[in-house]
């Protein structure tokens, strides 16, 4: 299970700084492109630490769990960055809380 700390952008950066100072590994996820129905805009951010604790949001809940899992995997593999792409068809949109289908691209990177 993942634990969310905050949604405010200012708090996200403060939280990341606190985690880094306490020697935790941190991944920053940033929305870099959207198409169609997307609850959050380009530039939305989320941080994730190695324990799965996160602050912020990149999709309003639609793909957060996948982004958290990918972020933890990035830390485990000691990779620096990765681009994630998620597509939701019109038929599946309601299942993830969207009015219609869309696409979201998210860039994740370690910031330690």
Question: Predicted regions: what is each one?
Answer:
Residues 2-112:
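Segments forming oxygen-rich coordination pockets for charged ligands
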């Amino acid at each position: 299970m993942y634990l969310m700390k905050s949604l405010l952008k200012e708090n996200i950066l403060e939280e990341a700084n606190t985690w880094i100072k306490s020697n935790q590994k941190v991944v920053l996820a940033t929305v870099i492109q959207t198409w169609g129905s997307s609850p959050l805009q380009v530039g939305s951010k989320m941080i994730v630490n190695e324990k799965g604790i996160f602050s912020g949001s990149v999709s309003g809940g639609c793909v957060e769990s996948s982004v958290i899992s990918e972020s933890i995997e990035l830390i485990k593999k000691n990779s620096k960055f990765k681009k994630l792409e998620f597509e939701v068809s019109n038929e599946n949109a309601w299942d993830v809380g969207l009015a219609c289908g869309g696409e979201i691209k998210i860039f994740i990177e370690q910031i330690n």
